[in-house]
Amino acid sequence: MLITTVHGQQIEINNIDTNHGYLLFSDKPVQIPSSFEHHCLRINLTEIDTIADYFEQRLRTDYHAPQVKFLYNKMRRELAGIALRHRNKRGLINIVGSVFKYLFGTLDENDRVDIQRKLETNAHNSVNLHELNDAIQLINDGMQKIQNYENNSNIINSLLYELMQFTEYIEDVEMGMQLSRLGLFNPKLLNYDKLENVNSQNILNIKTSTWINYNDNQLLIISHIPINFSLINTVKIIPYPDSNGYQLEYTDTQSYFERENKVYNNENKEINNECVTNIIKHLKPICNFESIHTDEIIKYIEPNTIVTWNLTQTSLKQNCQNSFNNIKIKGNKMIKVTQCKIEINSIILSENLFKPEIDLTPLYTPLNITKIKTVKHNDINEMISQNNITLYIFMTTVIIILILLYLYLRYVSFNPFMMLYAKLKLRKNQNQNTAQQIEMEDVPLPLLYPSIPAQV
């Protein structure tokens, strides 16, 4: 019985004439690969061993600290500026004046005193200059270590980058081998061998297997890539009581189809369950059945479909005819509605029954990714240099401050202990003044006018 109305609203009621203990219900079709392209990815195990030995040798000889090139160049420029300034300020005695007089014996007493003072100053400056040279030598040694540090850093950065790429390649191959045991394809293998017929739609349908060629010491990962697909109808198995009240003991919700005398589920996996395969092939099922303990049944098959079993005459309310006319139904029925709603024994059936009535907002923040950039070796070095700039500037500033402080203390003849001594001396004087004031408060003042007793 089919009742249709305008605007696509429809209610369909059909009799169920079966006595098997189950129903076969048509489900949506699935897309199944019909032809494949076979591809082989060859991995030379001998070459991998050679590369592994190369990295082992590099790690033994080239393991050094990270680079500090920026700090080294900065220190070179600052040191050149400091040496130039001190060389201009620290000249010897006047060659045209005092030395000329001394050589020819024309100096007088004033000249002698002036020359002696300059010679003493020059001797003192020579001592200071020797100490400065020691400091400069120490700095030069440190900068030489920094330069060696930088050279070794370039080597280790290159080594780490190459080792990272090689390790990632080995991990991808290993994952491909593990997934091939399950017949699955590792998408990361596409990084090493681009395949024309592989896309996001069929990548889950790619099957793989792993082989080893002992003669050439090669590992072969063979991919079966689907290039053509076909639509195949599927069916669901629905337990439904027979006339004696027994139904199939079955709880699965998968859909099945038959191809080349084999049964597969909707994920294209072969089914070996004899009960399921016989039902799909319309053979005599070898299954377990169970007794039901109810007089009648009303249950959902899909959001817009229900079935009834042994139903007594019942009134069905519906709005599929733009009115709420009741329909009397009885027995074993399958009821399906389209763009309308029915109600039977307080059970509401609608095509939109299971659609949410509230707005579900995701709890995560969507990521606006417009482009993914591949990071290259040069980019990695640049990022490392940029991240180290702050550290380099800080270290350079500290070293310059220490050098300036050293020069200031040496050549300005500033004694940092004088201020400490002055503070201690001032505090001692304040303590003495306080003690004298306390003693004065304890001594009683003299009486200028002695008291005279009163006479009566």
Swiss-Prot record:
Signal peptide positions on this chain: none
Keyword flag Glycoprotein: yes
Keywords on record: Glycoprotein, Transposable element
Positions of glycan attachment: N44, N151, N228, N310, N368, N388
UniProt protein name: Retrovirus-related Env polyprotein from copia-like transposable element 17.6
Lineage: Eukaryota, Metazoa, Ecdysozoa, Arthropoda, Hexapoda
